Each structure stands twice: as C-alpha cells, then as structure tokens.
Amino acid sequence: MNVLRMMDVPLKGKRVLIREDLNVPMNDAGAITDDTRIRASLPTIRAALASGARVMLMSHLGRPKEGVFDEKASLAPVAAHLSQLLGRDVPLVRDWLDAGKDRLAQLQDGDVVVLENVRFNTGESKDDEALSKKMAALCDVFVMDAFGTAHRAQASTHGVGKFAPVACAGPLLVNELDALGKALQNPRRPLVAIVAGSKVSTKLTILKSLADKVDQLVVGGGIANTFILAAGHSVGKSLCEADLVPDAQAIIAAARAKGGDVPLPSDVVVAKAFSETAPARTCRVDDIAADDMVLDIGPDTAKTLGDILRKAGTIVWNGPVGVFEFDAFAGGTEAIARAVAESSAFSIAGGGDTIAAINKFHIEDKVSYISTGGGAFLEFLEGKTLPAVAMLEERARGTHT
C-alpha cells in the first residue's frame, strides 16, 4: 500500500481535516451505548493535537435525510463524549460549510472541534464534486482515518481527498490495512478463514475469493446449512438456499483443487423452533429430522474445527457459527472463540456479530487485530479495491481521478 501517512506529514500550524468513523450506537435517550469506534480514533486525534495542528473532525452518524438537520443524528453526544475522553473542551460546529466557517477560522494550534454530521450536507452520498471542493477548501491537510467507510465513495471519504492540498492516511486506517494485508497478501500458513452468517448469497463473492487463497475454509451459521445440503444431507426446515447448492459445490471443488478444503459439520445442534427456550438436541448430520432447524455446530465438529484453528498460522474470522445469542446454541461459537484465543496464529476478526461474540466470551485481548469495519472488512476480503484507499494511492503517485 503506497500512500502518504499522517505521521510523515508536518502538521504544526496546519488546518487538519480528519475523517473518522464516529458512527456509534445510541439508545432512545440519545446516550452512546458502545464507544469502541470513538476510542479507536483517539490515537490519531491525540497525535495530530500533539503536533500542533488545528484539528477538525468529520463523521457521519446514522442515515438522516440529506440536506436536513435531524437532532437524532446530531454528533453533539459524540463531541461531549470526546470532551470527556480527551479531558478538554471539544466544541460541535454546525453549518460548517457556510455560517459556521467563521468559527473554524478562529481555531488555534492545538484546538479540536467536531463538525456536525456530514450527511446533513446535500451531495455527500453521491460524492458531489462541488461539495467535495468546499470541504477541501477548509484544510491544508486531509486525513482519511475511517476504515469503516473506506468502501464508500462519498464526499467526506473520497471526493474531499482528491481536492485537498495534501491527502494522507491516518494511523487507524494504516493499522487496519496493514493487518488485513498481513492476513491475506503474505500470510503465515496454514491460512484458515471462518465465514459464517445467515445466507450464502450475501457472502458468495467472499467465499469464492477465499476458496482460492486459504488452506481451510470454515463455513458456519445458515451458510453451513447450504453446504450440508450440497454434500447430500437433509437440513430439515433450517435456513438454507437450495438454489445455491451448485455454487457451494463449486466452492468446495475450487478449495480442494488447490489442496485446501471446506470442512463440513459431522454433528449439529438442532431444535424444532427458532427460540431461546426451544429444547436443543445434538445429532449426526445424517439424522437431521424433517422438522428440525440446525442452530449450531455439534461438539465433535467444534473439536475438529478447534484443532484446525490451533494449528493455523493465520486466521480470518467473519461470523458466528451458531445462534450464539441463545445459550443453548452458543457452544459452537464459544469453542471457535476459545480456539482462536488459544492459537498462536495471527488472527483478525471483523463484523458486528463477530465482535459481539468476541466480547461475550471475553477474548478481546487474545485476537491479534479486531477490525472496526463491517462492510469495508468484507469488501477487502472479496478482493475489491476500496475507493478511499485507491484515492490515497493516486494522490501519493501524484495523479487524480
């Protein structure tokens, strides 16, 4: 990845516009319920302030209607929380492209402000050129640090970087890309990927891409049911996609053709209903009844997969292998989590459900790298080019798109 890095750019006295991903969950009362993304941005913010920059932070929050102020999507709670974490006043600036510009002109070296939700600006999602130029005019240096939105070509993530005097990657973005590159571009072998979730259709391109790269492709959740069906077993009334059986068979064949494999469950945990209170039964995959729903992998499968993970050199994890929110069907995901934690492999995990599972089983400090990106993490796994990263690479080469 050939990009200019923030740490290599002189920032003292410069107006520095940093795009972070501060899109945090909030409850109905407007209180932040998980500040992981805010905390992840702190090293970048502190480094810019320590350099004597005049720091302006940009982010989106939620999906408000463009061009309309919506109190529920205001970054005011984020600015207040940043004030607490940084131990200093972090004002929120509204209408920052127009009337609020006067406030930005008053910034001194070492000051920091939060700019109100970028999605209140008409043209943000369409990467509008005029809007991008107005944003770029606010700064001497643009820092793209939001890996979680790097897969979106929008004005605040992509367009602004094309027109800013200097465009560079922030430490968080650099760390994310370095970790993903280490896992996929030159991995320590064996490389094991865990791809789970409810539907094959949503992760088909990822499965196909990884089948060519990995030594073992572990499938779980509803995705595994389609693969079990592809192997000739019944899955009862489980969530599965029968029309994608040929795709599943092709993925298995592709993995085996290059010496890899897709290890399928030998036993599963089933129930008659998708419910926390439904009685759970463990059975062989040959014994799934017509009215059964597969809701987790069984203990034999968990042991087999655990052994594979403990011997891995690199692990990429996206998705829980069962309905881990229900304790009766959490055993498989817990076993996977424990195996990842105990493995000496370089491990990277991403996706909301995966991170929730990591937190539930308290292995945060045992995973080498936990990605802050959901969609961006998946698109990187697919082998897609992330627009914001492509823009930074083009700027580093001295070209514009």
UniProtKB/Swiss-Prot annotation:
Known EC number: 2.7.2.3
InterPro entries: Phosphoglycerate_kinase, Phosphoglycerate_kinase_CS, Phosphoglycerate_kinase_N, Phosphoglycerate_kinase_sf
Record key words, sorted: ATP-binding, Cytoplasm, Glycolysis, Kinase, Nucleotide-binding, Transferase
Chief location: cytoplasm
Pfam families in UniProt: PGK (PF00162)
Molecular function as annotated in GO: ADP binding; ATP binding; phosphoglycerate kinase activity
Any one Gene Ontology BP term: glycolytic process
Catalytic activity: (2R)-3-phosphoglycerate + ATP = (2R)-3-phospho-glyceroyl phosphate + ADP
Pathway(s) annotated for this protein in UniProt: Carbohydrate degradation; glycolysis; pyruvate from D-glyceraldehyde 3-phosphate: step 2/5
Gene3D superfamilies: Phosphoglycerate kinase, N-terminal domain
Keyword Secreted: no
Binding site for ATP: K203, E325, G351, G352, D353, T354
UniProt keyword annotation of Ligase present: no
Signal sequence, start to end: none
Gene Ontology CC: cytosol
Residues the record lists as binding substrate: D21, L22, N23, R37, H60, L61, G62, R63, R119, R152
SUPFAM superfamilies referenced in this protein's UniProt entry, alphabetically: Phosphoglycerate kinase
Location of the protein in the cell: Cytoplasm
Oligomer and partners: Monomer.
Annotated family: Belongs to the phosphoglycerate kinase family.
Protein name: Phosphoglycerate kinase
Native source species: Acidithiobacillus ferrooxidans (strain ATCC 23270 / DSM 14882 / CIP 104768 / NCIMB 8455)
